[in-house]
Amino acid sequence: MYKYILFDLDGTLTDSAPGIMACIRYACEKMGIECPGDSVLRAFVGPPLMDMMKKTFSLTDPEAEKMLAFYRERFSTIGLFENSVYPGVGEMLSAVKSSGKKLALATSKPEVYAVKILENFSLSGYFDAVTGSELSGAHVEKRDVMALSMQKLSAKKEETLMVGDRKFDLEAANELGVDALFVSYGYAEKGEEIPYRPKF
């Protein structure tokens, strides 16, 4: 019986791809880099952005930091709100909360942005804890934010369920010994979840 439910944000509760992709395009323009097509940009939804920028554009750490600063320049004021809640999410969170579960948000997105997004969509009240990365780059790995969320809730791993849409969520759940529920409507590539064998 699960008492603690951890939720990913992007691709699980909200469709944030439009804002993220627009901000990557903006950062590419600022950096003078040719921007790839949408199929490549969609891969930026979910994983830590610095890692994706270095890998996709062959950037050094300082170059990736500069690109991330340009990304945040637009995201913090515009991109964050180019986002929508998936149908039924509010009702689902309400039902889970009403059943007596403790809920936490566990996202690699900076916590300061995650809080604003939840507030913007009136979802804050469902969560007992919100955990994201720091703007400094700390706690950017999914395992770290999940572990911190569990710490905030005083959650035992055998009583915890992670809900997410990407391999990063499932891999982190496996590493922490937590069951996972994979949502298929998010940003995962076809079959991405199979090697991680989520419980649901």
Each model region followed by its residue ranges:
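Acidic, Mg2+-coordinating phosphoryl-transfer loop and its flanking beta/alpha structural elements
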Residues: 162-200
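Active-site neighborhood of HAD-like aspartate-dependent phosphohydrolases
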Residues: 1-43, 54-59
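A short, structured active-site edge motif that brings together acidic residues
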Residues: 69, 124-139
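Surface-exposed amphipathic alpha-helices with a cationic face
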Residues: 90-98, 150, 170-174
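A metal-dependent, Asp-based hydrolase signature
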Residues: 46-77, 87-91, 95
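Short, acidic loop-to-helix structural element flanking the phosphoryl-transfer center
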Residues: 77-105, 111-115, 143
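Conserved H-loop
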Residues: 34, 123-128, 156
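Conserved Lys-Pro-Asp/Glu-containing loop-to-beta segment of HAD-superfamily phosphomonoesterases
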Residues: 4, 141-171
